[in-house]
Amino acid sequence: MIPHYYEDPHTLHVGTMPNRAYYIPSSRRSDALVEHRETSDRFQLLNGSWKFRYYASIYDLQDAFYEVGYDASAFDSIPVPSVWQNHGYDHHQYTNIRYPFPADPPYVPKENPCGAYLYDFTYPKDATAPRAFLNFEGVASCFYVWLNGQFVGYSQVAHSTSEFDVTKFLQDGTNHLAVLVLKWCDGSYMEDQDMFRMNGIFRDVYLLHRPEQCIEDYFITTDIHGSTAGVAVRLRYYDSAVAARITLYDAAGTMVGSVTPVEAPDDAAFPYHAEITVVDPTLWNAEQPYLYTLVLDTPNETITDRVGIREVHVANNQIYVNGQSIKFHGVNRHESDPVTGYAVGFEQTKKDLLMIKKHNFNAIRTSHYPDVPYFYQLCDQYGFFVIDEADNESHGASEYYCEGNESWPNHVENWNKPIADNPEFTEATVDRTRRCVERDKNRPCVIIWSMGNESAYGYTFEEALAWTKSFDPRRLTHYESAQYRSKNRKYDFSNIDMFSNMYPSLESMQEYLDNEPDKPYIMCEYSHCMGNGPGDLEDYFQFIQSHDGLVGGFLWEWCDHGIYKGKMPDGRGIYYYGGDHNEWPHDGNFCMDGLVYPDRRPHTGLLEFKNVYRPARVVKYDRESGMLTLHNYMDFVDLTEYAALTYQVSCDGEVIDNGFIPYPDGFTLPPHSENALPLAVHIPDKGKCFLKIFYHCDKDLSLRSEGHLLGFDEILLENEDSRNQKTLAMWSDAPSNSTITVQETDRHLTLRGKNFTYNFNKLTGLFAVMQYEDAVLLDKEMEFNIWRAPTDNDRKLKLDWLAARYDHCMTNAYRTEYQVTDSGVTLRAKVGIAPISLQKFLDLDVCWTVFNNGAVTLALHAERNTVFPELPRFGLRLFLPKEMARVSYFGMGPMESYCDKHHAASHGYFSSTIWQQHEDYIRPQENGSHYDCDYVQLDGAGIKLTAVGAKPFCFNASHYTQEELTEKAHNYELHPCDSTVLCLDYAQNGIGSASCGPRLAEQYRLDDASFDFSIRLIPEKA
């Protein structure tokens, strides 16, 4: 019934117009075409409710459904744009690398699902604009088009615009549009991105009404020459030339220049040229996104566009924009919505960019395909550097069976053969690059073209890179997978401007930089943001800033990919991930790897990034001179042009001073420089004192309003005694005239004081019962705690932990003894901790002191068997009454914090409920801990329990046990226990980003051969 184009890599498009730049024409100038393109009288949007029928196989479609008069009464309806999986058809499937069908390019399964779409619309003929062009901005995977029963054409490449001249097919009045979308085609082998696989017409469909003679395409370039700049416009017309006028206006609306294009016969692609000279131009960059307006007038039509004057080049292994070396503080962003899937509309796109900007990112990589056209216009306007990536990924080819040699090097050796180095796919590879480049070529935000992602390297990419450099030599090129190639021949890398890598360790980057490289190093993906993480951002930041040849990178990734499935009883969303739709193959929750949840609530990792990448930092504070030295990490803007500074001094959690920091007369702090300004503050002689410096926007600044917090620094102030005085007071032995009696059995020691009864288990060296003032403190025996619910970043390490059986440990006290003193009772025990079936890995010398007033101090020394892997954690776990549901503490808060993930938190006194401590990751895991704490207090039901450390410790308070968090696959499956679970930790293993990255850095591993831990428990009546 249909031409068999969908398995022919040499028939990519039929009946489509040549690639061109994105624009929306109008009959008159319109400055609202970015946010409101529907205001153009030449733009007819065809979105809405379409008739739809799903077929499980293309062979089930026997009717000529596209014919006028076809009985479509059996059709359902579906919104366009949308993906059909989100409307009850087919099934969702998430895979990262593996093809969801047999790998036999260019062939796809015979039972190829498809969707038939029908839509009737009225076409109002306009004598001044009689031509009509039908645009599809995104369809997955390929599609056939009929209009009024006549075949119009075919196209593929899901995330790119396909345009058809339908003038001869249209009729006055009602028109009948039919579209057939196939789930798979030969192009599906090149659309193997790490995402849910979805299908349908997922971007806008519209008609453009055009005059008979008009501009077809234009290419804007800018060159800077000292105090002037040239704005050049190369253009071509449909059929024949037409009178044109090109005018440039500045942001205030003042005309800068106006010219008429002249013929340029030597330029076949754009045979008409024009250039406007701008004196004293205001340049575009990500921090100051200044835009001019360009108006292209022809009879009966006007095209309005934006121009950013900027240059980009590589020198000295650095990337320069307008002559200034830059660093990318970037993020990878998929177009993903939990309700609409691929169909991410304007408002969601704008919301994402607003959040990204507010959290101090300056760059975005469009992973791994071109985004909707208005995304780039918004990036121009808001200020982002963009790596624009072609819709090309054939990662599944790396999974081919390799003749019994399944080693990674052998997979790399063979990865390129099916597609990247296969001449049959050269046309398709170049086509995907061209469709990206030619559509987005006029966007100043785009400074790098990327050939695609994870597709190995070969002849096809050499051709794509050569074409890109020839077509647009003013921008840079990127392709990370150039390193994955066969050793059997030499390859051409001359058209790649940078060395790109994913998830490198600091050591591997240092090795590259030490070998006198000839290209800058960029991390196209790093710090995998899956679940609780990432935990290595500060280390990467410091490394990036200390090496000129390292130009920064792009976190993976912006949002969790989840499918919305309704709400829990408490109103929280339910989200599915890979495998939840009974699909196979799938890759589980590996799609839940973003800085925000599917509904765009921030993960704590997003807050961590924001403060790590704050635009300025304190270098030092000299108490004697009262001088505060700052470094400006911005690339273009002086600190005084964007930031207002305030300060706060706290002592033992109490704010004792705060105020505004004025800039001295003549003070400047240019980009990449340091300077000092005066700040005199009073510092008490005693107490743990911190100085916090806050950076606020001092005016509206590209999506960030005046007063918006850009970040903060925290400095521990030196004084005579920098210990927390409240902590010291808690460690003081309170006098008591009472005494303690001890009763001993073979199993227990029962200690009774004036207002407490404690039962000590001699077999474990731990307290089994604690009652104070007739209130129960322990619901069950306390435990030495080793396990934590593995985080997503523990996904590799947890295999070692499970092999060591850290989740099934037993505690054995070899001997115990006690001694009664005037102040209380001392209990000593020799304790071993061993996994079931394995040898012991911890020896503990334990000393408990129970004071007459009921306070209890633990002091222990631990020796670890170093043949075992690093510990998840070590500490005490207490099961307190559930009614003890309020927590107060001095430590790092208010959000969760860990040894390598605490830069969004700060030291202070915080108070909340236990439920507020829980970070509700979609896949349950360790969460809600607090690092560097002096004390924590839980209270409720008339009783309080305070834990105070001899040294700073970590704690976690939750209504979920670590066993529950470990066992359950989704947050909506969790059941709270009947206790408040308090974990008092000597330390936890760091967080890192090893879910898809290097092993946790050594300094964050809990692998001490020996350590000491001391903590005091103080019960009180509330």
Regions found by a protein language model. Name each.
Residues 147, 228-263, 627-661, 687-696:
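Beta-strand-rich binding/interaction modules
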Residues 86, 91, 98-107, 156, ...:
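An acidic-aromatic loop/edge-strand motif
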